[in-house]
Structures are given as structure tokens and as C-alpha cells.
Amino acid sequence: MSIHTRKITDACRDKDCVEDLRVYLTAGSQQTLDSAANVRVRSAQLLHTYIDVEPVAFDRNHYCIDITFYYRILADAVIGTCRPAALSGLAVFSKRAVLCGEDSRAHIFTSDTRIAEADGCILSSSNRPTAVVEVLDPMVLSSKVKDAESGTAESVTVQIPEAIRALFDEDLVTSGDHRRLYVTLGQFSIVRLERDVQLVVPMVEYAIPEKECCDSEGCCTEDPCEMFSRIPFPARQFTPTGCDRKKGTPCDQD
């Protein structure tokens, strides 16, 4: 029997430590930061990952994968009150990987290929591999607040898609701020290239499950106390976990 699926042509893993990543705060959070005495970052949440695949000019089998991660940063600001004020903002991190995606000269069209909007563009029919990125929410390693230097601007202006801006209740402040929040994040990710292939697999008879479904109330005919008696006593959970100072997580530096 012939099937159509994807095969992994190449893959890599990364352990990125992104230092001093600027956080673009919302308008309200920026006002709070300007008057805050101290700031502590609570968490970083991955919102979206943009992936672009382009062939390498000098090697037809390899492709350049540009990846941009968008994070929601949540922090607490101490402004002299008993309860800290919540801060929210966006951090952006970009990286690049080069992987082997194999070479294919065929052009692929499918029945769901449609002409796009009135700009005259059509969906691409080139047979490029598909990039897949698996990533965990990053760990916040440290944070700090720095004064924005007057009369200077960042060397690179960040491009924030409208769909990402819409995820925040207020506008994001990208310029004209007095103080800036920076974070250092640790992130684990896996990047791979996949390509469509046709495979021939041996066909066997349809597998019929041998296990019968439970039709009694609660789907359990066994005596609950008898089932509980076979569970081992969780002695490890009653033992306090010791502190290893050599492997402890570093405190946030403001």
C-alpha cells in the first residue's frame, strides 16, 4: 500500500542563553517602570514563532531557516506600596539555522491552491521542505533596569506584526522611554526540516481491539479499597527536598 507522509531530512537542537533582551512594555507598564524602585520578572511566555525557509545560494541541498520568537514578559514593580504593580511587555529574539533539506526540482500543485488577494500573487508552487520548530517556554535567568540614553537610538528597529500587537491591551512603547527593562532568557528548542515523500508499506488486516470497554457506572468494577491497597506508600514525597547551593538557580539581578 502506498502512503503520502513527511520524512525528516535533518534536525538540530539548541540550548540558547539570550542575554539582555529588551522588553517593550505597554504604555501603562512603561509609566509604572519610570517611577518604580525595583522590578522582578515573574515569567516569560512564548506567544508565536515566525519561520522563514530560503535555499542556500552555494549549496542546493541546504536551506537557511530564520526563526523569530515573540515572548510575553510579566513582571512586578515595587513603587512604594504594599502590593507590587504588574508589568507586561513583549520581547523578541531571532536566530538562524542551516539544515539539509535535500534537492527536488519538481513543482507541486494541489487542488486547494488558490489565487491570493487582489495583489496578483499566487501561492508558491516550489518544492521546498517544511521547517518545524519545537520550543519550550523560556526560563527567566536574570533581569535588570537601565536608563535610556538620551539622543541615542537602537541600532535595529524591531518589527512587530499587528497580530502580535493585538495580543496586548495597550500599545507597546518602542521609543521615547526613560527607563528600559532587560531580561536574560534560557530556551531549549529543536529545529527540523521535513519533506513530502511517498512510501510503500506492507498492508495487514485491520487490527480489532481485544480489550472490552467498561460499561459499569464509574467504569470501574474493581473494589476501590483493593485497588488502593496495591499502591506503594509514597515515602519519597514525605522527605523534604534538600537545597544544593552549588546548583541553585541564580537570583534575578535588578
PLM regions: where:
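Viral structural modules
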Residues: 1-254
